[in-house]
Amino acid sequence: RGAALTAVLDDAATHCAYAFELGAATRRAVTQLQNNSHYRFSAVQLGWIGFGWRGAAAQGWRGFRSFGRGYQPRSSNAQALDAFYRGQVRSECGVGRQVAQLATQRELFGDAGFNEAFTPGELSIGTFLTLHDTDSILLGAHAGEFFADGKAVQTSQLGRQAFVGAPGFIAHVFDKSYLDDIHNQAENFVVVDVSDAAAQALAQHGGFAYYDARNRQIWELAKQLRGPGKRRFERLLYERDAALRATLDPQQQTQLRQLQTLLDDPFYQGFSVYVHPKGTKPIGYHVARLLDRNPRTPYAIDLTLHNLRTTLYWRWIDWQLQRCGAATAAEQSIENSATPAYAGRGTLH
């Protein structure tokens, strides 16, 4: 019976059902995070993560590394995540990605399950290097088996839902000497939604490598359209600002149409990611935005190592089985307590 149960739980249909639950949990999590206007990007602060005037302890966190490089929940895991849902916190986008991943687990398990199924150490946040030396369920000692698919070659063959919840990043291709804005050398994301057309495009082209080459084309074409304004390409290519477009000469208009044709690809329009503090937007927005921030280098897109369909999947399955076992035991207890001692000899009416 145990082998049969394991086979069912490891069946593709069960994994598919889990993927839909995970996707819904991801969307709930990032909605909470992006709706908190007090969760902001790093500014002038004393540590890597800043908990404002109230401090970390008052918002449910305990520091274990100096300069704000490592925190874990003090008591209630769910209460600690509330700091990012409703409190005042500052962090860069790497921590934002960690928080989105952990918040997804909170939404998936529910508050009670999130508190019971994970230890504080497993929910550590901080620099990525810090997490490797902890029990972090994301990157530390308890992460277990990782799925490595940087260019999404395998994931792109599994359908749109296989992407949702997966962590990744957009990073500069040339070395750091080509960066003008070090704070935008990379963007860390969690995939929130993938349209059918975007999934089909990724499957057809075999993942992200094709789009890294497209990013290079976009970057080359954009050189001819550079001009004044901090958000020039964001306005031209994402907002499609008619007034700004009208200032371009005929040759630039032709180049703009070429750029827009490239960015109208379903992947750029329908592959939506959450990036702190920008919220959920199509990946094409980030490609356009980074043309403004670091115009001297193209960018590439990768998924990071993750355990959504290995360790975290089985952790969730174990929790569901525990709940079923507890419910069955409770029902049996109620039945036993409700059965009179004389029931076996007949009952009186």
Summary of predicted features, one role per range:
Residues 1-167, 174-185, 191-349:
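Cysteine-nucleophile amide-bond enzymes
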